[in-house]
Amino acid sequence: AKQGSSSAASVVLKRQRLNATGRLADATDSLRLLCSQNSLQASKYARILEDHNQNRQELQKESIDVAEESLGRDAINHVSGQNNKIIFITGSFNPGIIGLIASRLTQKYALPSVIISTQDNIARGSCRSIPEVDIINTLRKFNDLFVDLGGHPGAAGFSILPQNIPKLKKQLIKHFSLSLDNYLPSNTIFVDARMDISAVNLKNIKLINSLSRFGIGNQEPQFLFETVKIDN
């Protein structure tokens, strides 16, 4: 990456391309790139990974559009007279991108998300949560419904028999209608500090980058710039 550029951005871009192959097919080409012995070989597999990543981006956008259409019809509406406090969507999504869909919807609507792919005989689900909810402990309350289950407080994945999906949906809607009864979804942006625009310089960028790697448990710092106008 160029001097002064964000290490987080660089890591994300590289990771997206390495992960895209495994999401849509298998990760062999990613491994071949990492094991390349010369620039010609590396360029060959880098182009393949870039194609996979573009395909992943297109499929992800299409799938999120489909999921949001479903939200408009059902998931954000009243269910059995109660406000629904969870996004729960099933469909013929590619299993490799259901986590990306769940992340996007949780980020947008500030609600726990469960996205289930029903492409195979055993359905696969991916969940993303909000700070108020320990999603893995919540799912463990209904452990008998799953074939397999794993994760952590912020995200989880599972496999489930199709006939158990309606039961899971009913149980989760009931659970969250009680546990999040007073929760009002909002896309609140939390900032770590106010900053003057004059503080945006190479020295401070390097200091921030020295705190990486960023991710769950070590989020990238968020700064507030007041009275700043952005022109296109």
Regions inferred by a protein language model and the residue ranges of each:
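Single conserved hydrophobic/aromatic residue that forms the stacking wall/gate
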Residues: 1-14
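A contiguous loop/helix-start segment that scaffolds small-molecule binding in enzyme catalytic cores
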Residues: 175-232
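A generic structural signal for short, non-catalytic loop/turn and secondary-structure boundary residues
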Residues: 5, 81-82, 151, 184-186, ...
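Hydrophobic helix-and-loop "lid/oligomerization" segment in the mid-to-C-terminal part
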Residues: 15-166, 170
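A generic helix-loop boundary/linker signal
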Residues: 2-3, 57, 198
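A residue-level signal for beta-strand positions that form part of recognition/binding surfaces
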Residues: 9, 85-86, 188
